[in-house]
Amino acid sequence: MKKCLSLLLAALMLAAVLTGCGGNPSTEETDAPADTGTEQAAQTNWNVSSVTGTGTELKFRTGGDQGTYYGFGSVLAQAITTNGNGTKVTAVVSNGSQDNIEQMQMNVAQLGFVQSDVMSYAYNGERLFEGFPYADFSTVAALYMEQVQIVTCDPDIKSVADLEGKTVSIGASGSGVYYNALDILAAYDLTEDDINAQYQDFGASADALQDGKIDAAF
């Protein structure tokens, strides 16, 4: 199963930043050069936000401190800070996709990694977002496709169906891994209640597998 990881920017916070940096908005026309990046994005139907103006500070929600997202996010934040014309981006540990969207919605953060399926749930008010749709964000960039892997040290577990009754780490609640796990289990007519679910990040899952505390991990 492949998922697309996206970098999101809270649209409401973007408006606040631009207003704070630029003073009172003006309706006067200027001879400023066109934003060719935005024009190109429009031609390719990408949903992006173009950030211009003076420097600012942005909080960047990533993932667990032992996972890929935090490491990648830290490198990305440093690259933007170094080359961002005065913009300082700080990578912050988080509980994953749902947490990142919620923190942006509360104006605690301005950037975040979110898997494309979780982004859709938030926008449409589905699953854990039911009744509370979040639409105040924009996609900055699509990053890369992901593959979901199930890891086990138990030779008797040969398929997803064999996870029934087992102790399985399915990621932090609300994370992209968590939603992936539920979807994969459902494809085999299993639910969260059919396993002894553990809600651990990648690092904790690896340690638990090694110590024999869990049977498998997503």
Model features per residue range: what roles?
Residues M1-T56:
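Short, low-complexity disordered leader/linker segments with a strong preference
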Residues T36-G53, Q78, L111-F113, P133-D136, ...:
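Extracytoplasmic/periplasmic mature domains of Sec-exported, cell-envelope-associated bacterial proteins
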Residues G55-N83, T87, E146-K213:
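Bilobed "Venus flytrap"/periplasmic-binding protein-like clamshell domains
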Residues S74-Q78, T90-G131, I150-C153, G203-A208:
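Pocket-flanking alpha-helical
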Residues F113, A217-F218:
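Periplasmic-binding protein-like
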Residues E130-L143:
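A structural signal for short loop-to-beta-strand junctions that line the ligand-binding cleft
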